[in-house]
């Protein structure tokens, strides 16, 4: 088990998609109306707060669902959670996860281990770039940020190095329990549960966005 920050390793695989200057993050849940919309929009919000001057084409953040409610709006409680964080919920429509989404993605972050398994089962060499959100957070925390390329080299270059380093840590840095890698589904739950899930997602995203950008986030 890793005992401290590790360098960003090479040779652990890389994204299958995108040009050298573009990095795509795909968030996956079941219906694409609760967890993955919250995660997508909180990721965008956090990136914009830290990298306001980075072209939008450098980091593209999307989401889809394994049983996606194609064309549906996000749940009202999900939109309310985003409003709590000051994040934009407008213009969202649900999508069903397709092969093309996985092919294009440089990093796939799922709500649960079952979602991760479903993405990997689609093929497209997705295994080395697909993690649950909380799994990726745990691995990222063990990576020495000083070993990642500086932001001056481009945010996409830094992001790809981060994914390679995280993939190299698999099997060495295990979850304390299977449930530790899960974000539970709030579908149909009251707003209080949605808010607890929103906080959980935000806390998991913070070290990921910090590692991607090299910028610590402002306090909420």
Question: For the regions a protein language model found, what residue spans apply to each?
Answer:
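Phosphate-binding/catalytic loops
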Residues: 2-9, 13-15, 120-220
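Conserved active-site segments centered on acidic
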Residues: 1-105, 113-128, 210-219
């Amino acid at each position: 088990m890793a005992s401290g920050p590790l360098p960003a390793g090479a040779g652990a695989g890389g994204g299958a998609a995108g040009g050298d200057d573009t990095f795509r993050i795909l968030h996956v849940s079941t219906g694409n109306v609760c967890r993955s919309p919250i995660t997508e929009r909180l990721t965008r919000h956090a990136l914009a707060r830290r990298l306001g001057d980075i072209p939008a084409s450098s980091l593209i953040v999307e989401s889809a669902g394994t049983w996606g409610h194609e064309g549906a709006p996000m749940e009202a409680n999900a939109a309310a959670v985003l409003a709590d964080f000051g994040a934009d919920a407008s213009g969202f429509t649900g999508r069903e996860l397709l092969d093309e989404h996985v092919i294009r993605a440089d990093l796939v972050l799922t709500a649960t281990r079952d979602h991760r398994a479903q993405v990997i089962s689609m093929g497209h060499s997705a295994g080395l770039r697909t993690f649950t959100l909380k799994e990726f957070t745990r691995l990222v925390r063990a990576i020495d940020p000083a070993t990642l390329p500086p932001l001056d080299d481009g945010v996409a270059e830094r992001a790809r190095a981060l994914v390679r380093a995280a993939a190299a840590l698999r099997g060495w840095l295990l979850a304390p329990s299977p449930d530790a890698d899960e974000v539970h589904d709030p579908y149909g739950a009251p707003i209080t549960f949605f808010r607890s899930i929103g906080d959980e997602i935000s806390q998991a995203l913070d070290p990921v966005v910090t590692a991607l950008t090299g910028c610590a986030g402002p306090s909420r």
